[in-house]
């Protein structure tokens, strides 16, 4: 076989391997694909309109910490209102967020940065989302994982087989993880603690239930 043909063969093999490796998202590359058992996954944690969800909040950005109170309230079937205040009650941010809309009611000038607002919009929309349409399912010994497409992103919902509750949501591009939500809950209805951890930027948000 001529050297040029051998080279082309090697290149084609390498391309096949690369394309195959890219076709499976790294989030679920170690999980087995299984037949789809449900097409809708409902998240209960922020869905009760009669409840004010109040948490102590700690936001860490590139080594800088901001602490305060996070309040989320479902104000109608599609929309949540989100307020972040200092521990003394001074309002820092006030948003209204739904599946398709995002409205900034108020924000202090120190936090009024487009990149921060866009990041928080994506974080909070995923946090407060109640219903996910499921296209694929994966599993291992401990979890069922449900994949839900969301525009040019994918959301992976990790449901514990042992505890029978949603413990994590990973948001990713088509190939790699972008950020994750981690839920700690005792009753599968209310999350006592929530963490939002980003992979590409040094941003971590920690919510702990405020017991008055």
Label every model-predicted segment:
Residues 102-134:
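Acidic/charged, solvent-exposed loop-and-adjacent secondary-structure segments enriched in E/D, K/R, S/T
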Residues 57-61, 66-90:
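N-terminal beta-strand/beta-hairpin edge segment
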């Amino acid at each position: 076989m001529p050297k040029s043909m051998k080279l082309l063969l090697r290149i084609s093999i390498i391309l096949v391997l690369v394309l195959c490796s890219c076709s499976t998202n790294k989030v679920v590359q170690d999980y087995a694909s299984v037949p789809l058992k449900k097409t809708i996954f409902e998240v209960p944690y922020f869905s009760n309109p009669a409840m004010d969800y109040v948490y102590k909040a700690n936001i860490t950005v590139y080594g800088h910490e901001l602490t305060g109170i996070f309040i989320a309230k479902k104000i109608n079937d599609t929309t949540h209102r989100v307020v972040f205040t200092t521990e003394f009650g001074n309002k820092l941010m006030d948003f209204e967020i739904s599946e398709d809309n995002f409205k900034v009611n108020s924000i202090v000038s120190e936090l009024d940065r487009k990149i921060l607002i866009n990041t928080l919009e994506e974080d909070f929309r995923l946090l407060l989302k109640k219903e996910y349409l499921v296209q694929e399912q994966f599993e291992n010994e401990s979890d069922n994982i449900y994949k839900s497409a969301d525009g040019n992103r994918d959301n992976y919902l990790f449901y514990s087989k042992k505890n029978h509750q949603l413990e994590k949501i990973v948001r990713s591009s088509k190939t790699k993880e972008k950020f994750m939500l981690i839920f700690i809950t005792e009753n599968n209805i209310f999350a006592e603690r929530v963490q939002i951890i980003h992979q590409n930027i040094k941003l971590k948000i920690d919510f702990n239930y405020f017991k008055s």
